[in-house]
Amino acid sequence: MKLKSLALAASACSLLVALPAQAQTEIQWWHSMSGQLGEWVNGLAKGFNDSQKDYKVVPVFKGTYPESFAAAIAAFRAGNAPHILQVFEVGTASMMASKGAIIPVTEVMKTGGVKFDPSVYVPAVAGYYTAPNGQMLSLPFNSSTTVFHYNKDAFKAAGLDPDKPPTTWPEVARAAASLKIAGHKCPFTTSWQSWTQLESFSAWHNVEFATKNNGFNGLDTRLAVDTPLHVRHIQNLANMAQQGLFVYKGRNNSADATFVSGECAMTTGSSALYGAVKRNSKFTGGISTLPY
């Protein structure tokens, strides 16, 4: 978000609270940006704060996305919710179902006098943040996608082509076998399992993840992850785990650190991991599309 947009959006949000006249309006911005992205968020807020005297944005790191989301829900119920909350995309649907919890971003922009055109966003991204009636509810910010990360140095050492990452799941299994023979105790892992191995897996194969337009068209939806394709995929991962080719490293993004450190040679996760790899890893990392 540009600083001007942030200023006007903050101005609109500040209408929700009663503050003394002439007082500087403080805007609480809860987020889940850690590391380099956290530094960027702090810099973004500082740049805006230094540009004017009427508003002060206070960025507050609240932990992982689930932790931030839970904290925001608790704060809302207690009557002291933050003005701005940055969480993962799936938070939009939950907030959409919670009447009165949020003000749609289109309304915030309109109140603030900001020209706002949701159509400028990539449709696949905008869909995450938009209600069935076409109204954008939340603002795409630092959106990421699921990708395949791999250690090019480990590939070379295992006799694999570092410029040809596996593009299919059978190829992932074969690459993992070569990495295991080369001495890797964790050839392949994954973070955000439900996102990478179910939701994105479904989209990549053009199959349904949940009924009712992925839940946007009604609360009586159900997950559709018990199809033969999904069952076969999870069984293949289980088989790889039994062979020591796939190693589970915990929930959410716990596996990310094991890839950055070089412990695990391949992983599926967020494209946001790229920054940590470039900054902290002692190996050359590669990125490719999800396997199919």
Which positions does each model-derived feature cover?
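Hinge/lid segment of periplasmic solute-binding proteins
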Residues: 88-147, 173, 199-203
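Extracytoplasmic/periplasmic solute-binding protein
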Residues: 132-141, 146, 156, 170-222, ...
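Short, solvent-exposed loop/beta-turn-alpha elements that line the ligand-binding surface or hinge
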Residues: 106-121, 165-167, 207-232, 279-280, ...
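Extracytoplasmic/periplasmic substrate-binding proteins
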Residues: 32, 200, 205-207, 231-292
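Extracytoplasmic "Venus flytrap"
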Residues: 26-44, 62-65, 144, 196
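Extracytoplasmic "Venus flytrap"/periplasmic binding protein-like
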Residues: 43, 47-121, 157-159, 258, ...
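Glycine-centered hinge/linker elements that transmit conformational signals in sensory
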Residues: 173-179, 216-249
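Short, well-ordered beta-strand elements
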Residues: 24-35, 55-60, 84, 137
